[in-house]
Amino acid sequence: FDAIMEALSGYQADYSLDRENAFLRWELPARFLGYRLLLLGLRNGWPILFEHSNALREHVDLYKKIKSLGYRIHMVCIDATPEMVIKRLARRNRFFPEEQVKKRWDCLIDLLPEYQKIVDDFKLIQPWKNVENL
């Protein structure tokens, strides 16, 4: 829900003063808005692109529910180790708690087998194999 958070004027104002506090203040409101938009799309049968870390056990049930609504799910997982993610965050000059990076990675690795059983199509991409200095 990064794009939603970054579009909020309150986040932008807070970010200009202190990026860590801006993240801590606006992450949950952005997440709330993101899930509301997802629900709106599902209720209206819209095509949906849901970009997320998928590091939440609740997403197993979410994807099952989405499938029950007749949606096909195509999941693309970007294989990026916590070390790679932390480097990228530093280059983006965007705050995200480092301890959460590892926590999310561990959760995602644990959930991937379940996701692979649910989704219609699963792709694991490793862009770092073809690009230098990620």
Regions found by a protein language model. Name each.
Residues 1-65:
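Conserved nucleotide-sensing/catalytic segment adjacent to the nucleotide-binding pocket
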Residues 3-5, 55, 79-84, 129-132:
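Conserved nucleotide-binding/hydrolysis micro-motifs of P-loop NTPases
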Residues 28-31, 79-80, 105-108:
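Short C-terminal domain-edge/linker segments immediately following a structured domain
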Residues 83-134:
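Conserved GTP-binding G-domain of TRAFAC-class P-loop NTPases and closely related GTPase folds
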Residues 67-89:
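Conserved phosphate-donor/acceptor-positioning beta-strand/loop module used by diverse small-molecule
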Residues 45, 69-74, 117-121:
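Short glycine-/polar-rich loops that comprise or flank the Walker A/P-loop
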Residues 50-51, 77-78, 125:
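Small/polar loops that bind or transfer phosphate-bearing groups
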